[in-house]
């Protein structure tokens, strides 16, 4: 194998199999583009993004790791979200949860 070389199997790779998903329309009401990364807790995205925020608690974009979705000013777009896996704790982002998703504080 050459350093940095990929050895990828033939066939389909299934991501987030058997995970709860949610599809919703998101509008950028701001005057600047907003980019959201693959593992960003969608509930805590920029307030200029308009959508049913409470429904997205515990979800992230259902896209490949390391990628992002860009929302242009005035743009409406449909996205699919996937439930966050693991121990369901969220730290950082905009600081709105800072712990367990079930019992986290929300203002």
From Swiss-Prot:
Any one Pfam family match given in the protein's UniProt record, by short name: Urease_beta
Catalytic activity: urea + 2 H2O + H(+) = hydrogencarbonate + 2 NH4(+)
One GO cellular component, as annotated: urease complex
Enzyme class: hydrolase
Subcellular location: Cytoplasm
One GO term of the biological process aspect: urea catabolic process
UniProt pathway: Nitrogen metabolism; urea degradation; CO(2) and NH(3) from urea (urease route): step 1/1
Principal subcellular localization: cytoplasm
Annotated CDD domains: Urease_beta
Assembly and oligomerization: Heterotrimer of UreA (gamma), UreB (beta) and UreC (alpha) subunits. Three heterotrimers associate to form the active enzyme.
PANTHER family in the record: UREASE (PTHR33569:SF1)
Protein name as catalogued: Urease subunit beta
Naturally occurring in which organism (per UniProt): Teredinibacter turnerae (strain ATCC 39867 / T7901)
